[in-house]
């Protein structure tokens, strides 16, 4: 997906480590976006031909559920394109299933020429534990920039105390709280909705 100048988004997989009830991509046609070797070659060719692309974003699904072999094939191709300066990966794996990140995965993420930015998705401080701390330490020591995005969810984190605790816990684990999103309107998730007015008051 090449929607904005300077960056391109790759839907790396339709699989996730956890299924979020409020996911805005639940009806995305993942079957049409299978990441086989032929598709990877086509994507890399497109990025190579567009020298204005400086950032590649891997999303999904969750790109870190890919095998180290498949992820390595994609990352090696991206890293060989000299005008790509940043690789941004959006994932919930570090907090919901950190065991999926093997030594091979970590080696891939920490050996890139391009700057790697890992945008985690943590909505509540209770999602952070000793396992996530150990993993974040390894990634940070390997030069990976760690950011976080949260979705404002009614009854989960729509109060100042929880949001403050979340920010503090993220900072303690070396992750910068970066995005706080309003919920996208998806079927079956209206009970999580927080009004924009309340969201603005929480941020004031």
Predicted regions and their residues:
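N-terminal [4Fe-4S]-dependent radical SAM core
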Residues: 1-10, 27
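Short, well-ordered loop/turn elements at secondary-structure boundaries
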Residues: 4-6, 17, 52, 174
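Conserved catalytic-core segments centered on acid/base and nucleophilic motifs
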Residues: 10-11, 23, 56-58, 63-64
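Iron-sulfur (Fe-S) cluster-binding segments and ferredoxin-like electron-carrier domains
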Residues: 23-35
